[in-house]
């Protein structure tokens, strides 16, 4: 009996040893690539253009949804906890409103500037109208392509720090990508220079085009200022209509991630048509126009220039 017991004990020990080895091998295999999490589809696309297949990438806020206020899913919590590197926009986008990102990284025991980084670091911040204090920043810095280039450089820097063996790969992709963005930026500046001053105003639902306005010399007007406040009230619509009566703006625009009904009301009451949907807080679904940061910006720039030249 002792002999049988000894054999059984040896068998069990060997079995657990094999399982442990198998688990270890599987774990190592799955962790060969850097695990990266981004808060939204725009950051995910910029990251993908630099990192390619060298990383495992998870984006939290789904395409077409508003990143200002979001409730992370269990899968988001799991991926964030497992992440080697996390990129968020910053400038009060994910940390304003219901502060969903602040709670997420705290619960995942992640440390700022060690595990998670603001892609917007180094951007010249623009504030909401009449404000100039922390918590009142306009977060939509990526709508200026020069800032998109800053995002890309920040993302590449942290990828290289975490994964130095792929440094050359990341740097090569960064150079090609930023050159592409820079070329589009220059084309846009030229296009907007040729629009008559009396027509040059971009009118949107959310007042998210301040960075765009500064970069391309196109003043902006809006129904509400930021998506974390009340949206599309009669008073907000009335204020915009009064402003439009003093202009010769030929076209209105509505963002892909907001309720279009308030802008339809503005269009009806002002007799100014909605020319196109444009992208702000999200890229488009895969396979559609605007399904990358570059293509969404190209779409925006072309549609806005075309609409204002009517």
Curated annotation (Swiss-Prot):
<keyword id="KW-0464">Manganese</keyword>
<protein>
    <recommendedName>
        <fullName>Manganese ABC transporter substrate-binding lipoprotein PsaA</fullName>
    </recommendedName>
</protein>
<dbReference type="GO" id="GO:0007155">
    <property type="term" value="P:cell adhesion"/>
</dbReference>
<dbReference type="GO" id="GO:0030001">
    <property type="term" value="P:metal ion transport"/>
</dbReference>
<dbReference type="InterPro" id="IPR006129">
    <property type="entry name" value="AdhesinB"/>
</dbReference>
<feature type="signal peptide">
    <location>
        <begin position="1"/>
        <end position="20"/>
    </location>
</feature>
<feature type="lipid moiety-binding region" description="N-palmitoyl cysteine">
    <location>
        <position position="21"/>
    </location>
</feature>
<feature type="binding site">
    <location>
        <position position="140"/>
    </location>
    <ligand>
        <name>Mn(2+)</name>
    </ligand>
</feature>
<feature type="binding site">
    <location>
        <position position="68"/>
    </location>
    <ligand>
        <name>Mn(2+)</name>
    </ligand>
</feature>
<comment type="similarity">
    <text>Belongs to the bacterial solute-binding protein 9 family. Lipoprotein receptor antigen (Lrai) subfamily.</text>
</comment>
<keyword id="KW-0813">Transport</keyword>
<comment type="function">
    <text>Part of the ATP-binding cassette (ABC) transport system PsaABC involved in manganese import. Binds manganese with high affinity and specificity and delivers it to the membrane permease for translocation into the cytoplasm. Also acts as an adhesin which is involved on adherence to extracellular matrix.</text>
</comment>
<dbReference type="GO" id="GO:0005886">
    <property type="term" value="C:plasma membrane"/>
</dbReference>
<dbReference type="InterPro" id="IPR006127">
    <property type="entry name" value="ZnuA-like"/>
</dbReference>
<keyword id="KW-0564">Palmitate</keyword>
<dbReference type="InterPro" id="IPR050492">
    <property type="entry name" value="Bact_metal-bind_prot9"/>
</dbReference>
<feature type="binding site">
    <location>
        <position position="206"/>
    </location>
    <ligand>
        <name>Mn(2+)</name>
    </ligand>
</feature>
<dbReference type="InterPro" id="IPR006128">
    <property type="entry name" value="Lipoprotein_PsaA-like"/>
</dbReference>
<keyword id="KW-0732">Signal</keyword>
<feature type="lipid moiety-binding region" description="S-diacylglycerol cysteine">
    <location>
        <position position="21"/>
    </location>
</feature>
<keyword id="KW-0472">Membrane</keyword>
<feature type="binding site">
    <location>
        <position position="281"/>
    </location>
    <ligand>
        <name>Mn(2+)</name>
    </ligand>
</feature>
<keyword id="KW-1003">Cell membrane</keyword>
<keyword id="KW-0479">Metal-binding</keyword>
<keyword id="KW-0449">Lipoprotein</keyword>
<dbReference type="Pfam" id="PF01297">
    <property type="entry name" value="ZnuA"/>
</dbReference>
<dbReference type="GO" id="GO:0046872">
    <property type="term" value="F:metal ion binding"/>
</dbReference>
């Amino acid at each position: 009996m002792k002999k049988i017991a000894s054999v059984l004990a040896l068998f069990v020990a060997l079995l657990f040893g094999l399982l442990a080895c198998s688990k270890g091998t599987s774990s190592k295999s799955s962790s060969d690539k850097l695990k990266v999490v981004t808060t939204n589809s725009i950051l995910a696309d910029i990251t993908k253009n630099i990192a390619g297949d060298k990383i495992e990438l998870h984006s939290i806020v789904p395409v077409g949804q508003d990143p200002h206020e979001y409730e992370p899913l269990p899968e988001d919590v799991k991926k964030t906890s497992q992440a080697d590197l996390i990129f968020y926009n910053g400038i009060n986008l994910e940390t304003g409103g219901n502060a969903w990102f602040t709670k997420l990284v705290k619960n995942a025991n992640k440390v700022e500037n060690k595990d998670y980084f603001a892609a917007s670091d180094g951007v010249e911040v623009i504030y909401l109208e009449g404000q100039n204090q922390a918590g009142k920043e306009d977060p939509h810095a990526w709508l200026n392509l020069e800032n998109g280039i800053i995002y890309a450089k920040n993302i590449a820097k942290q990828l290289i720090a975490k994964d130095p063996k792929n440094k050359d790969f990341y740097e090569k992709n960064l150079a090609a990508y930023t050159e592409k963005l820079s070329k589009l930026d220059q084309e846009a500046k030229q296009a907007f220079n040729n629009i008559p001053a009396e027509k040059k105003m971009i009118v949107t639902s959310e007042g998210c085009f301040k960075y765009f306005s500064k970069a391309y010399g196109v003043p902006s007007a809006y129904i509400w200022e930021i998506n974390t406040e009340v949206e599309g009230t009669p008073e907000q619509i009335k204020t915009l209509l009064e402003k439009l009566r003093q202009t010769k703006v030929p076209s209105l625009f509505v963002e892909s991630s907001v309720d279009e009904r308030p802008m339809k009301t503005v269009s009806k009451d002002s007799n100014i048509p909605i020319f196109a949907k444009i992208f702000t807080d999200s890229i488009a679904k895969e396979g559609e126009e605007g399904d990358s940061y570059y293509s969404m910006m190209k779409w925006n720039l072309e549609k806005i220039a075309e609409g204002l030249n009517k």
